[in-house]
Curated annotation (Swiss-Prot):
The gene is PNPO. Keywords: Disease variant, Epilepsy, Flavoprotein, FMN, Oxidoreductase, Phosphoprotein, Pyridoxal phosphate, Pyridoxine biosynthesis. One of its GO terms (biological process) is pyridoxine biosynthetic process. It comes from Homo sapiens. SUPFAM superfamilies: FMN-binding split barrel (SSF50475). This is Pyridoxine-5'-phosphate oxidase. The modification Phosphoserine is found at residue 241.
Amino acid sequence: MTCWLRGVTATFGRPAEWPGYLSHLCGRSAAMDLGPMRKSYRGDREAFEETHLTSLDPVKQFAAWFEEAVQCPDIGEANAMCLATCTRDGKPSARMLLLKGFGKDGFRFFTNFESRKGKELDSNPFASLVFYWEPLNRQVRVEGPVKKLPEEEAECYFHSRPKSSQIGAVVSHQSSVIPDREYLRKKNEELEQLYQDQEVPKPKSWGGYVLYPQVMEFWQGQTNRLHDRIVFRRGLPTGDSPLGPMTHRGEEDWLYERLAP
């Protein structure tokens, strides 16, 4: 592997040398050019055409791609996703978490309402999800409004989790500052003893959300960077309103188009 830095060319005989050299450079505050880091995706014969859509309902199309991701032995957590939220004054934040269900009504996930994402969703109830399945060269982006799930549903899911995870949710006042990890260990041990023979109560600050999709984009990578992008959006045109020549009707109120990469 060869990498170019400002004024420096470094060649590595073994991939294992790369992380160590990166650490060395970071310690010296070197400016790093990662331009040469590149991988091949799919060829043109494997392009994602409109005729390859499993359904003209994007949630069903997501289900088809999700099933392929689940079956792929190189993907450990097909339901891992990046959740992006934003404050009312436009400061974004993003983090990885797990999708816990999806359907026509939306995409479900659970978290602590007092976390940064919880506070941002409370003040600005819109979000974006991104699923990236690298071995398949595929990505799905979902945008839409978010609302809290009913308390009964949150309660049901909470008690379906392993008891250690339930206790962990009680221990952690997510995003609050703590003295050290030992603090968490002690709190966890105390609660393990307290709830050894009884049910763990769900914290009031813990629950679920559902994101109602208004935009869903399906991306598939191409080696020549002419990536495939097919986007679905809920349409404003109603009835027999004419559509543009490059806009197509999907199922129900969905419209879809191909975007330039």
